[in-house]
Amino acid sequence: MEAAAELQIPVLVLDRPNPIRSDIVEGPLLDLNFQSFIGKYPIPIRYGWTVGELAQKIVAEQWIPAVPSLSVVSMEGWYASLWYDETNLPWVKPSPNIPDVGTALIYPGMCLLEGTNVSEGRGTDHPFKWFGAPWINGKILSQELNKLHLPGVVFVPRSFTPISIPGVADKPKYENQLCDGIEIRVITRNKYQSINVGVSLSLIHI
């Protein structure tokens, strides 16, 4: 939109659903002192808006240096509590490591751990659902996490070996090394709190 504004080109957004519902919001607002390419606006981690609603908010709040002429074509037959897999629309990966709605739900919390020395499952068939490292005891970690009784989720021990996958995971953490850890198994997605899970994982000491 910034480039369109600079070139005086109108922007037309054909709105699409937020894949993990629009009526659930999680996480703190971004501190703009830590603004980056992956976090640009003062919005929660799981912000809930559709792409059209986000575009309208960016323009209304003037979060970019120049704002374009924006038009949003609204959806029909959509409501905020719909999951993407309830829309009958084909799934298009928003990222190579988000292959399905289940991963999209888990991602907002697990992405907080990408900068750590623990594998977030890249280089496996279950990115962000698996979490571990060669020095972790998955049995103990799963037991400690399950003691927290976090809503909508159970944690089970999981061993895995990350590998490079062309176009998906290039030299992932602990490539070709056996990692022990946990699998995040969502059992009630309407109750699952992604950010709470990510923060809880980061605070566990084993």
Where would I find each of the regions flagged by the language model?
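Conserved small/polar residues in nucleotide/adenosyl-binding loops
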Residues: 204-206
